[in-house]
């Protein structure tokens, strides 16, 4: 057997080392799996658009580099690379762009997504089919013709003209094969006598069956029963074979007995409608070349060659085994091949055109043929799906699946074309992405898909022409697709007419009217977009959206116009098509003398064009003979020369008999090399191809004289071209004309309304409010504020405009103000005067009241051990000059008790200071000071009038005089007297410790400090430390009983004990004593307070029993929100905190804490369910009123107070299929991860509007208006994982992370100097208080060690507190940071090396580019004079552990650092790995190496590793591509070798 080679076999091998690795058993599988995992990892990670552009750019560069040198391996690489880019696009589409706000948007967006999924599926299936074309070569036949098999040649016909069929029959009779072993049969389903006569004349067999059931398949099956050849060769009646057909194809059938089918290409020597009708069509490959030049050759590699109904040899045994040709569908050919392959038969494809046929002459016929193909393939898909059933390999299943699903293109194509109209007409944004994101993801996907297809298809199909082909047929196929999928038995076989003539060109409306309608609609959408871009007042987002969708519409319109241009049928008067051919000929006279020699230019059944020089002037048609030699056989053909000149002669044949006709057919069609140039088109160049498509549109706009009114062609009729899918043409014309009129009218109305809208004002300015006095303390009320006591809703009390006694307050003169100060100074020692501004009491700023927000208030507390003896409210501010004293006022109340009334003076808008005396009996522990604004006449107020307002300055004062009450020393009152929850201010708790500062005593003190931190929470607490009892005030004394100060009397205890005793120096002060007989008992006593499971006794003494404390789990701090299930708002705050009153009820806040190391896959948002009930009553406009939702001062969403279902919902409610809108609304809301950090607060602002603005309404209606959230509203963090990149001091500033991962700090040790001073110990206690406030849990697990014993806690996180005098001891602990402390200075000691910087720049090029001009910040700061530094770095003792160092030369610096941690405003500035605090100034730095703490599931590591790292995505993705290509190329080569080896084995057996 001769050697059979494929391009796969000839491909150059892998490099030597890769070849050796792959040759190891199992190595290919391992490398392939690793490469696939890398590829999946790279495709699963999305990047911000600007980073994705880097990936896109590099992939494009790689595409050009690899594609520059074509080879099999480079093609495979480009396909895998395209898969990588497309899968990244798909991941981005599925995870980033599916955000729909309306049902219409969701429907349209889902339709587009499904269309894209279909397109991607077809892209990958096409790559699979064409990854390794087999390029099968002919095999020689046995040398002895006696061994050649017998062949029956079938030429089925139904209604075609004899002039067409006779060419095929005569050509078949001329095939080189032993005459006794071949028989030509005319299968005439038309049962026409002239065909029978022709068969008898030429020597062919004539077969006509009595009935026509099952169309072509039935005809063939009938002929099988009347013939007996070993093989069956089938030609459609217009396919004229070459003489070498059997000799080139039969070798494979003889050599391999498993081959049931040998298919060859269908080549058409006449142009198809696209080539003929489009201006650039003549230089464009025929539509079918892609299938026969690329796809079928690729199918052959997978043993999945399809039977195409003609130009194919079939083994009779195989056909009979399946019961004949398939008749269940209208595409008997593909279904027949599928049936044979299910039984184990193989199929083969020889990519050599051995027959030529006629293409469809007119577009309407072409569409009709494709309709039949689509119906048939979809019928097979439904009734004999290749994915199911037995007998097929996965390669065969996928190839057949690709062929069948390719005919589903109609619906996706229409969706792609019309999608921009969703925004241009309806304002529905169906892809939730910015134009930059689309540029970064979608354009590379399309570039690689087009570019790779161009490399694969070469000159077989030009880029962008598939879009024209599909668009031309899409709207016709939509109905066919849907009907066939739903009812696969519908439809019948339709014969495609061939050989018609067109006397004159015309515009075929019946073939393009759907696209004309679509084009008009698209033009209307484009016009709308251009109009809005030109004249609309658009913001940046809307402008980009219009620009993007207009560009999309423009591209769609160009494709549609190109498809419409195909409908301009060109004139076709030639009976015979010219075929280019270069054949030496001699022109002779009748006597045989040679007149001239020449070479043919083209041939046809009508004549020939010959390059020659005619020796004399031609006076008229002259009879001649043209003589040539073909394959050793001389042909002499009679002709007449009718024109000669310019080196060219035109001849027509003068055929008188069948033999002469046979000779002409042999010359024109029968040459073995007749069609070898069928694929000689220039290689595809996508940009030139796009230009050709655009130029083809120009054909639509030729001069009107070229447009001929619709007329029927001479022959044939298109009566059955579309069967049941084509209506009466005249009706189509009427529909088209009516549609054009309707679209034109709509366009006119749209333009008129748009113009009217453009000429009208876009907005009406609201009436300007009355001028307010300029004052820095009068800011406007924000729409959404964080929850503060100053912005909280006031109480429901509503004092009248004129209260009892009607005290209106008196202006406070300057001497009166001085008297207040003097009075405060002369107060007796037992009384204390407190002066608070409203800002001190918690007001966020000046208090402004309007009609919609008439009631504002402030909450404040009075210590429970103090008694108010007198009070005075001193107010200043301003009131609108539009207010009238007889109807308008501001009334003040304290705890709903009347204080006084402010009346406006229109001539003097500002007022104050004005003094109001307050009865001290009004005061309680928790107080509310309310300001109630009356904005109208008595009993009626215009609450919507923005010109009516009143403002109370934040500098107004409340002066309170108090006296101390006798102390009550009861442990049950703890944390009083040290902290009173009603007094919302920073707390100071003195600590008295033995000067030796024993670690166990310090641990006990730390437990108590953290407990106080829990009690004070965000207010903060400071612990001044001393070794002596203070002379006055309260304090906590901690120590072993025998070591307590002698001045205290050293109380006798029998174990751990807690006592409250009077201060020896201050009878009104209390000393809390925490003691025991030894240090362990002191710790137990501290735990007795911190972990008390029951209320402490109402006594001053308590003996403490040992406390059992369960080990803590990670992230289970009581202050942290649960993360394993949705958490109710009602579990975070009381129900009263979720309620508000009035049209503007203020901000409702839901605070919570959460670990800051949260991470979600691809930054998926957390889920929140907001539930609220729409208020009852008719005084509120609930459709215009809304609820604004935010988190940490970041706006999230707004919801109207009325639940709406839209138009469809209203219809469903009307027919009883949906429930009416209820009062309770439930909304699901996404919370972006970047808005969440340790200390968080949800904000809800009800902005209610009255039903009728500007109308006098009852003033009581406002305050009786109740709004609120349902406590069953939830927020869910269960999708979060814990991992973080360190160092990051921002985590420490919010909730003490990473130390508070365990609430009791059991994984933390505090490193103090060997002999700490009081300032250092105080800093330690303040820090423990901060930790307790962060976790609401005492730090019972923390250890205290010195630097010399730090190795004992090497596996823990370390908190280092040190002064400069002891900084040398802790220097080794900061060895992994970039800083050192020396000579009282903090300095930078190391920067990243040049190599490190290069690696960082490659890893994150965008950041490196942005920071290209910045230099590393060198730190050289003296840590003296109150300057403190906080440094965070990885522990040198254990990887993944953290060291946090607080350093300063004195206590003031340490105290400054800790105060900074407790201030919310400064926390935002704490970040990086170093913070330096100097007074109010704070500086952050980031220099130290990063490290990672936490764990993730395996599937999340790619996202974590490559998130925001485009270079890593590229490296991992390209590594995956290289590995997969290496394995795939080797596997494909071995697969091809196995196919040919099987053939050789079969031959040896035979």
From Swiss-Prot:
Q: Where are the stretches annotated Disordered?
A: 708-731, 768-813
User: Catalytic center at which residues?
Assistant: 189, 333
Q: What is its EC number?
A: 2.4.1.12
Please name the pathway: Glycan metabolism; bacterial cellulose biosynthesis
Query: Coiled-coil annotation: which residues?
Result: none
One biological process GO term for this chain?
A: cellulose biosynthetic process
Please indicate if the UniProt record lists Glycosyltransferase as a keyword. Answer: yes
Q: Where is this region: Catalytic subdomain A?
A: 147-240
Q: What does changing residue 369 to M do?
A: Loss of activity
- What cellular component terms from Gene Ontology apply here? plasma membrane
The entry's localization annotation reads: Cell inner membrane
Cofactors demanded by this protein:
Mg(2+)
Impact after mutating residue 370 to Q: Decrease in activity
- Which portions of the sequence form the region Catalytic? 1-741
NCBIfam families, from UniProt? CelA
Per the record, the similarity remark reads: In the N-terminal section; belongs to the glycosyltransferase 2 family.
Domain comment, as recorded: There are two conserved domains in the globular part of the catalytic subunit: the N-terminal domain (domain A) contains the conserved DXD motif and is possibly involved in catalysis and substrate binding. The C-terminal domain (domain B) contains the QXXRW motif and is present only in processive glycosyl transferases. It could be involved in the processivity function of the enzyme, possibly required for holding the growing glycan chain in the active site.
Function text: Bifunctional protein comprised of a catalytic subunit and a regulatory subunit. The catalytic subunit of cellulose synthase polymerizes uridine 5'-diphosphate glucose to cellulose in a processive way. The thick cellulosic mats generated by this enzyme probably provide a specialized protective environment to the bacterium. The regulatory subunit binds bis-(3'-5') cyclic diguanylic acid (c-di-GMP).
Tell me the protein's name: Cellulose synthase 1
Annotated organism of origin: Novacetimonas hansenii
Gene this chain is encoded by = acsAB
């Amino acid at each position: 057997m001769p050697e059979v080679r494929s391009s796969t076999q000839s491909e150059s091998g892998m490099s030597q080392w890769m070849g050796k690795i792959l040759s190891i058993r199992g190595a290919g599988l391992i490398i392939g799996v690793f490469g696939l995992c890398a590829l999946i990892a790279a495709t699963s990670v999305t990047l911000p658009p600007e980073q994705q552009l880097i990936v896109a750019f590099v992939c494009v560069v790689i595409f050009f580099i690899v594609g520059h040198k074509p080879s099999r391996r480079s093609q495979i690489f480009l396909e895998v690379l395209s898969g990588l880019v497309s899968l990244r696009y798909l991941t981005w589409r599925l995870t980033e762009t599916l955000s729909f706000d309306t049902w219409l948007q969701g429907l349209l967006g889902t339709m587009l997504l499904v269309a894209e999924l279909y397109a991607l599926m077809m892209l990958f299936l096409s790559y699979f089919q064409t990854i390794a074309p087999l390029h099968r070569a002919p095999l020689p036949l046995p040398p002895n013709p006696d061994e050649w098999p017998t062949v029956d040649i079938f030429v089925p016909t139904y209604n075609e003209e004899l002039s067409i069929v006779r060419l095929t029959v005569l050509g078949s009779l001329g095939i080189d094969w032993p005459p006794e072993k071949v028989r030509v049969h005319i299968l005439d389903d038309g049962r026409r006598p002239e065909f029978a006569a022709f068969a008898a004349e030429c020597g062919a067999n004539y077969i006509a069956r009595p009935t026509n059931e099952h169309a072509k398949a039935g005809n063939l099956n009938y002929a099988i029963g009347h013939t007996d050849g070993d093989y069956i060769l089938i030609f459609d009646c217009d396919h004229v074979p070459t003489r070498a057909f059997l000799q080139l194809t039969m070798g494979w059938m003889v050599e391999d007995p498993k081959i049931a089918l040998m298919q060859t290409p269908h080549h058409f020597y006449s142009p198809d409608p696209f080539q003929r009708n489009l201006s650039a069509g003549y230089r464009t490959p025929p539509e079918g070349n892609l299938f026969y030049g690329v796809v079928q050759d690729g199918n052959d590699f997978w043993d999945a060659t399809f039977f195409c109904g003609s130009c194919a040899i079939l083994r009779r045994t195989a056909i009979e085994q399946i019961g004949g040709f398939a008749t269940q569908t209208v595409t008997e050919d593909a279904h027949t091949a599928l049936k044979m392959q299910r039984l184990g038969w193989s199929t083969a494809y020889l990519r050599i055109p051995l027959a030529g046929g006629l293409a469809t002459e007119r577009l309407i016929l072409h569409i009709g043929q494709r309709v039949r193909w689509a119906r048939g393939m979809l019928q097979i898909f439904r009734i004999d799906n290749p994915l199911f059933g037995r007998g097929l390999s996965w390669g065969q299943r996928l190839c057949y699946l690709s062929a069948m699903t390719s005919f589903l293109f109609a619906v996706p194509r229409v969706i792609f074309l019309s999608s921009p109209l969703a925004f241009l007409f309806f304002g529905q944004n169906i892809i939730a992405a910015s134009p930059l994101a689309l540029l970064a993801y979608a354009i590379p996907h399309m570039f690689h898909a087009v570019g790779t297809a161009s490399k694969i298809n070469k000159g077989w199909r030009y880029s962008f022409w598939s879009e024209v082909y599909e668009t031309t047929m899409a709207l016709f196929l939509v109905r066919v697709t849907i009907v066939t999928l739903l009812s696969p038995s519908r439809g019948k076989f339709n014969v495609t007419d061939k050989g018609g003539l067109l006397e004159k060109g015309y515009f075929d409306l019946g073939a393009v009217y759907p696209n004309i309608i679509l084009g008009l609609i698209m033009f209307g959408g484009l016009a709308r977009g251009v109009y809005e871009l030109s004249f609309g007042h658009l913001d940046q987002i809307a402008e980009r959206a219009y620009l993007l969708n207009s560009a999309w519409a423009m591209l769609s319109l160009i494709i549609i116009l190109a498809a419409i241009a195909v409908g301009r049928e060109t004139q076709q008067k030639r009976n015979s098509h010219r075929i280019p051919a270069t054949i030496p000929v001699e022109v002779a006279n009748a006597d045989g003398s040679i007149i001239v020699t020449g070479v043919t230019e083209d041939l046809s059944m009508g004549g020939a064009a010959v390059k020659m020089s005619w020796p004399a002037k031609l006076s008229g048609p002259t009879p001649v003979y043209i003589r040539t030699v073909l394959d050793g056989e001389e042909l002499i053909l009679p002709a007449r020369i009718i024109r000669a000149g310019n080196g060219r002669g035109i001849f027509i044949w003068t055929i008188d008999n069948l033999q002469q006709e046979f000779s002409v057919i042999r010359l024109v069609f029968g040459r073995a090399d007749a069609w070898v140039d069928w694929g000689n088109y220039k290689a595809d160049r996508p940009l030139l191809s796009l230009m050709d498509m655009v130029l083809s549109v120009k054909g639509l706009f030729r001069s009107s004289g070229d447009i001929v009114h619709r007329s029927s062609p001479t022959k044939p009729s298109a009566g059955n071209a579309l069967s049941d899918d084509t209506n009466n043409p005249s009706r189509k014309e009427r529909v088209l004309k009516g549609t054009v009129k309707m679209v034109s009218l709509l366009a006119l109305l749209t333009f008129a309304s748009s113009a009217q809208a453009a000429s009208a004002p876009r907005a009406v300015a609201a009436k300007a409010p009355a001028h307010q006095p300029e004052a820095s303390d009068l800011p406007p009320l924000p729409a959404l504020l964080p929850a503060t006591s100053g912005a909280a809703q006031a109480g429901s009390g509503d004092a009248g405009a004129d209260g009892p006694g009607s005290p209106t307050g008196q202006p406070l003169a300057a001497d009166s103000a001085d008297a207040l100060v003097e009075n405060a100074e002369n107060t007796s020692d037992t009384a204390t005067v407190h002066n608070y501004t409203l800002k001190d009491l918690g007001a966020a700023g000046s208090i402004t009241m309007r009609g919609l927000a008439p009631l504002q208030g402030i909450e404040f507390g009075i210590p429970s051990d103090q008694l108010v003896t007198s009070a005075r409210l001193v107010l200043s501010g301003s009131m609108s000059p539009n207010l009238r004293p007889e109807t308008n006022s501001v009334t003040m109340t304290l705890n709903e008790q009347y204080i006084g009334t402010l009346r406006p003076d229109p001539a003097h808008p500002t007022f104050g200071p004005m003094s109001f005396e307050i009865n001290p009996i009004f005061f309680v522990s928790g107080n509310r000071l309310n300001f109630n604004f009356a904005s109208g006449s008595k009993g009626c107020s215009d609450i919507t009038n923005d010109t009516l307002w009143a403002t109370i300055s934040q500098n107004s004062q409340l002066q309170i005089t108090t006296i101390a009450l006798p102390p009550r020393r009861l442990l049950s009152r703890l944390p009083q007297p040290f902290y009173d929850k009603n007094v919302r201010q920073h707390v100071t708790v003195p600590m008295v410790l033995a000067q030796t500062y024993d670690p166990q005593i310090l641990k006990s003190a730390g437990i108590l400090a953290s407990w106080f931190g829990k009690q004070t929470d965000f207010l903060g607490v400071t612990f001044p430390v001393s070794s002596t009892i203070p002379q006055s005030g309260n304090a906590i004394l901690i120590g072993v009983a025998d070591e307590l100060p002698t001045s205290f009397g050293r109380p006798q205890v029998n174990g751990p004990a807690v006592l409250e005793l009077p201060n020896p120096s201050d009878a009104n002060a209390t000393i809390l004593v925490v003691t025991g007989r030894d240090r362990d008992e002191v710790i137990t006593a501290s735990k007795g307070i911190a972990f008390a499971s029951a209320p402490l006794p109402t006594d001053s003494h308590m003996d403490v029993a040992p406390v059992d404390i369960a080990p803590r789990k990670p992230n289970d701090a009581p202050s942290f929100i649960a993360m394993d299930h949705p958490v109710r708002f009602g579990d975070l705050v009381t129900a009263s905190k979720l309620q508000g009153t009035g049209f503007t009820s203020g901000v409702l806040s839901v605070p919570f804490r959460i670990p800051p190391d949260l991470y979600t896959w691809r930054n998926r948002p957390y889920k929140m369910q907001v539930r609220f009930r729409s208020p009852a009553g008719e005084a509120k406009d609930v459709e215009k009123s809304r609820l604004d939702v935010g988190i940490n001062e970041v706006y999230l969403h707004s919801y109207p107070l009325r639940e709406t279902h839209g138009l469809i919902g209203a219809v469903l409610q009307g027919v009883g299929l949906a429930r009416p809108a209820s009062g309770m609304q439930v909304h699901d809301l996404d919370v972006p991860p970047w808005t969440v950090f340790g200390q968080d607060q949800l904000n809800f602002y009800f902005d209610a509007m009255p039903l009728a603005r500007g109308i006098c309404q009852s003033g009581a209606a406002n305050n009786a208006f109740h709004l609120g959230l349902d406590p069953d509203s939830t927020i869910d963090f269960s999708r979060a994982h814990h991992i973080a990149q360190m160092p990051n001091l921002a985590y420490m500033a919010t909730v003490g992370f990473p130390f508070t991962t365990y609430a009791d700090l059991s994984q933390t040790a505090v490193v103090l100097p060997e002999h700490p001073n009081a300032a250092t110990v105080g800093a330690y206690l303040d820090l423990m208080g901060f930790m307790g406030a962060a976790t609401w849990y005492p730090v019972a697990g923390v250890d205290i060690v010195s630097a010399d014993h730090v190795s004992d806690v090497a596996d823990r996180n370390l908190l280092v507190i040190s002064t400069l005098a002891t900084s040398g001891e802790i220097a080794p602990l900061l060895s992994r940071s970039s800083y050192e402390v020396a000579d009282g200075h903090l300095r930078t000691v190391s920067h990243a090396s040049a190599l490190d910087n290069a690696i960082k720049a490659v890893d994150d090029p965008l950041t490196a580019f942005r920071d290209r001009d910045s230099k590393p910040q060198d730190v050289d700061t003296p840590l003296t004079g109150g300057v403190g530094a906080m440094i965070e770095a990885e522990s040198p003792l254990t990887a993944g552990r953290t060291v946090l160092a607080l350093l300063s030369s004195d206590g003031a610096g340490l105290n400054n650092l800790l105060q900074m941690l407790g201030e919310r405003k400064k926390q935002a500035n704490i970040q990086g790995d170093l913070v330096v605090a100097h007074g109010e100034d704070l500086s952050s730095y980031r220099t130290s190496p990063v490290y990672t703490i936490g764990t993730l599931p395996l599937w999340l590591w790619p996202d974590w590793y490559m998130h925001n790292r485009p270079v890593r995505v590229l490296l991992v993705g390209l590594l995956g591509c290289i590995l997969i290509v290496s394995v795939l190329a080797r596997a494909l080569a071995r697969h091809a070798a196995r196919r040919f080896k099987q053939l050789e084995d079969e031959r040896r057996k035979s």
